């Protein structure tokens, strides 16, 4: 059994990336082999890794086992029985955090769930002076008030989408799950993901990387490795369906692997707004603040939904300040550059700018092809590069659109019982391709760019060469090449009969400068989003 596992591990180490091998294969261990039943049991340190390895690697491990023993082997994945007694390899438990002060909890009436009352007028114990006794009584009263408030937390938390707190951990500003406890059994592991609201499927391993998102991915990995130290806050912005949500879930999932006791919460901005409203209605801001201020990692998606909501912004500002002061990590996403989000308080904008702001651009052609090929592979379908290239060339906006198109192609192929070819793809995507071709034209690009740079549309066709005209013209040529199916000669003809070499020079010049000039990159991003509607 051990000989097989050494053989299997060595092969998988060569087949996988170093990150995949260390994250998923190295923590596994063979625990039993039944020669009579031809079953091999492999232990995983926690439920998350067990489920992922079972879904992604069980087939390959079964094949290797069959080859090794020259017989069909049933590979079973089980939780390591010792997982609850130790932290996973490489995991670093989080240091305890200092208790957070209570935000003046309201008095709570007596009842079976309340802490015993403290008599401030009771005689001081022997040997204790009056001043010391008063201080002790005050501390006991504060502790009792916190315990009383915590007794109601379960009901309030259910309404506010907050995990319930025990009296002890509410007083300490901490949630009920502890470092290492998440690995004790599958129920605890499932609870860990339920509390954090993370999607365990969204990881760095299955995030397709290209020029459009490589900086964002690098920053995300750096933050996952050094939360609260590198880039705090990390602000990711870009259009719909470009992978912002995938990346922030990947950060959370990686941190849970490295530090299973981490207090993590993913939340969409709309849910945060809803929680603020409910906390206000129920006078439950104590619980709200205690929960959010005690996190180790807060992932907040689509913060543009805070626009115009002053009370939400105020509460988030206080949470942000508390988290950063405690060296907790904050990660934010938006569809817009921070300074261009309307209706957001200047204090928040300045906090967003204090960390690292990274744009995620629409995927380039090669990346779109890679996304389609990987998605098809995950669906168990063989997709030719010709078909992937055809789809990627015609659909340019975002990953969700590509995945939706692929699902449509697969369904069309299955329904008609035909092989996936370019002809079938054209039939399956007929309506979508028609809409795409109708939406963006060279004329529309010229008008949009002219309006953006405050020049006349006629300047696009003219022979004028001042920088304030030549530059927008080159940008329009670049966008025409990127966003339409026109050839270089056709684009040149639409720009006043220019030669195709002039268009090629403009396209190469803008493409090269885009990678070096952050301002130009931002302007192009805005124009692309405007043209795509």
UniProtKB/Swiss-Prot annotation:
One of its GO terms (cellular component) is cytoplasm. The keyword Magnesium does not apply. GO terms for molecular function: ATP binding; ATP hydrolysis activity; DNA replication origin binding; lipid binding. ATP binds at residues 241, 243-245. Residues 96-110 have a biased composition (Pro residues). Keywords: ATP-binding, Cytoplasm, DNA replication, DNA-binding, Lipid-binding, Nucleotide-binding. One of its GO terms (biological process) is regulation of DNA replication. Residues 83-110 are annotated as: Disordered. Residues 414-533 are annotated as: Domain IV, binds dsDNA. Coiled coil: none annotated. Pfam families: Bac_DnaA (PF00308), Bac_DnaA_C (PF08299), DnaA_N (PF11638), Hda_lid (PF22688). Residues 72-196 are annotated as: Domain II. Residues 1-72 are annotated as: Domain I, interacts with DnaA modulators. It is found in: Cytoplasm. Residues 197-413 are annotated as: Domain III, AAA+ region. The keyword Acetylation does not apply. Plays an essential role in the initiation and regulation of chromosomal replication. ATP-DnaA binds to the origin of replication (oriC) to initiate formation of the DNA replication initiation complex once per cell cycle. Binds the DnaA box (a 9 base pair repeat at the origin) and separates the double-stranded (ds)DNA. Forms a right-handed helical filament on oriC DNA; dsDNA binds to the exterior of the filament while single-stranded (ss)DNA is stabiized in the filament's interior. Domain I is involved in oligomerization and binding regulators, domain II is flexibile and of varying length in different bacteria, domain III forms the AAA+ region, while domain IV binds dsDNA. This is Chromosomal replication initiator protein DnaA. It comes from Burkholderia mallei (strain NCTC 10229).
